[in-house]
């Protein structure tokens, strides 16, 4: 499978595993409903029920297991988000789901709660498989499963990703007592475990891709995903989620599914983040450090994430900040896996307030206290910008993002962002910003 076309298109025989219901499935536009900026379609095969008529004001309305409701209460969640209201009632009926919703709207909880509700754990069997594209995100998802399964003592969850000795994974999987019912991981490591027959997927009931566009866009990662997919049963439930799902990638996602419920929260061109104030500052490369120091001195914030374009710049900026007595840490692919997780936990647990990161932290990472995101280096495209600034203002809370614009390329990206999301980003005011407008 060396050509891209081979990775996108299955043969007729392979399609039988995902399109068994093609003759009876409705076209994607069938039953489309639109309310405000929410578009819902499909996902209503006979005898499977649907979300129609269900508008929940509380998680109890979803009729979830009592143990899950207790865990939800412990987490302090009262009302489901819009995406949770639409997806969960249908997803728990075993319907496939393709969902695009902005950062911070609770997509992770959709598949975590759905799969835990459906799960009947069998010792020594993996029933739920969740894949994502970075180790940090895998680690975070595993923690979400731990959080919501606290009253389900028989449920075992494990996370597998590269950068750590595979022998530890093999040992865990060779012991029936520790064998996980829920597996979370990155495609490369999971594929190695499946190929070596250390991880059996023959009992998988739910197959989940988080940040699915990132995995299916990259040829090598897509190849791993497809190989793993073929090792699972044909009649499983498939769910895919991302903050950005282009028109081009949606058909690729749907090749893995049968008549999915399609949920697109906000039109693709209007993926702005409510509650997040966004500004830019024009300056030269040489002025960046001084301006960053000024901002960190003058702005109020709980936690800040500062994005740079390379591991070298992350290390240099982190060192500079610490020399200026700013308590920062750096997270990027050049740091060992063990150290990355340690630093992630330090930041997550509020032991550090400033994090300098590359795009390894740009997607999916959910740290609720971040309310300031600074693009020290502007990203290469509009989608990456959305994912980065989405780290501030999670779940509809207030936040502030500031982007440094210093080159012609930066100006082009800024124009692309404004065009793509139909917004006009204002220049950062000389007098600064009133903290009450972005501090929750």
From Swiss-Prot:
Q: Where in the cell is it found?
A: Nucleus
Q: Which residues form the Helicase C-terminal domain?
A: 291-436
Where are stretches of biased composition, namely Low complexity?
Answer: 17-28
Tell me what this protein is called: ATP-dependent RNA helicase sub2
Origin organism is: Aspergillus niger (strain ATCC MYA-4892 / CBS 513.88 / FGSC A1513)
Pfam family of the protein (one): DEAD
User: Which residue stretches does the UniProt record annotate as biased composition, category Acidic residues?
Assistant: 1-16
| Recorded superkingdom | Eukaryota
Q: Where is this motif: DEAD box?
A: 210-213
Give a yes or no for keyword Disulfide bond in this entry: no
Instruction: Check the record and name the InterPro entries matching this protein.
Output: DEAD/DEAH_box_helicase_dom (IPR011545), Helicase_ATP-bd (IPR014001), Helicase_C-like (IPR001650), P-loop_NTPase (IPR027417), RNA_helicase_DEAD_Q_motif (IPR014014)
* Any GO molecular function: ATP binding
Which reactions appear under catalytic activity for this entry? Answer: ATP + H2O = ADP + phosphate + H(+)
């Amino acid at each position: 499978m060396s050509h891209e076309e081979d990775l996108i298109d299955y043969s007729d025989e392979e399609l039988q595993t995902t399109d068994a219901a093609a003759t009876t499935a409705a076209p994607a536009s069938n039953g489309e409903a639109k309310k405000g900026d929410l578009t819902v379609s499909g996902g209503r095969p006979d005898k499977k029920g649907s979300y129609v008529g269900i508008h929940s004001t509380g998680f109890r309305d979803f009729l979830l297991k009592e143990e899950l409701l207790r865990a939800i209460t412990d987490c302090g969640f009262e009302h489901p988000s819009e995406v949770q209201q639409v997806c969960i009632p249908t997803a728990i009926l075993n319907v496939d789901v393709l969902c695009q919703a902005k950062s911070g709207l609770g997509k992770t909880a959709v598949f975590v709660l759905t799969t835990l509700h459906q799960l009947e754990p069998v010792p020594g069997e993996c029933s739920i498989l969740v894949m994502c594209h970075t180790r940090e995100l895998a680690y975070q998802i595993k923690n979400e499963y731990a959080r919501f399964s606290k009253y389900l003592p028989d449920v075992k969850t494990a996370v597998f990703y590269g950068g750590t000795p595979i022998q530890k994974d093999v040992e865990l999987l060779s012991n029936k007592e520790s064998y996980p019912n829920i597996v979370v991981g990155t495609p490369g490591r999971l594929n190695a475990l499946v190929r070596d027959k250390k991880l059996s997927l023959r009992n998988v009931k739910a197959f989940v891709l988080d940040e699915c566009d990132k995995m299916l866009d990259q040829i090598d990662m897509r190849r791993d995903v497809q190989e793993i997919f073929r090792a699972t049963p044909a009649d499983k439930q498939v769910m895919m989620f991302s903050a950005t799902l282009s028109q081009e990638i949606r058909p690729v996602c749907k090749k893995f599914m049968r008549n999915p419920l399609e949920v697109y929260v906000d039109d693709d061109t209007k993926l702005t983040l409510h509650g997040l104030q966004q500004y830019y500052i024009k300056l030269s490369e040489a002025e960046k450090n001084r301006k960053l120091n000024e901002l960190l001195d003058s702005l109020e914030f709980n936690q800040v994430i500062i994005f740079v374009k390379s591991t070298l710049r992350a290390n240099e900026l982190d060192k500079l900040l610490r020399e200026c007595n700013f308590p920062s840490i750096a997270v990027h692919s050049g740091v060992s896996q063990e150290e990355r997780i340690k630093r992630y936990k330090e930041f997550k647990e509020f032991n550090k307030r400033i994090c300098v990161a590359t795009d390894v932290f740009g997607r999916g990472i959910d740290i609720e206290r971040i309310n300031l995101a600074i693009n020290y280096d502007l990203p290469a495209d509009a989608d990456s910008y959305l994912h980065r600034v989405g780290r501030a203002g999670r779940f509809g809370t207030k936040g502030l993002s500031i982007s440094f614009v210093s080159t012609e390329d930066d100006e082009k990206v800024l124009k692309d962002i404004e065009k793509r999301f139909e917004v006009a980003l204002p220049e950062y005011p000389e007098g600064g910003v009133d903290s009450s407008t972005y501090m929750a």
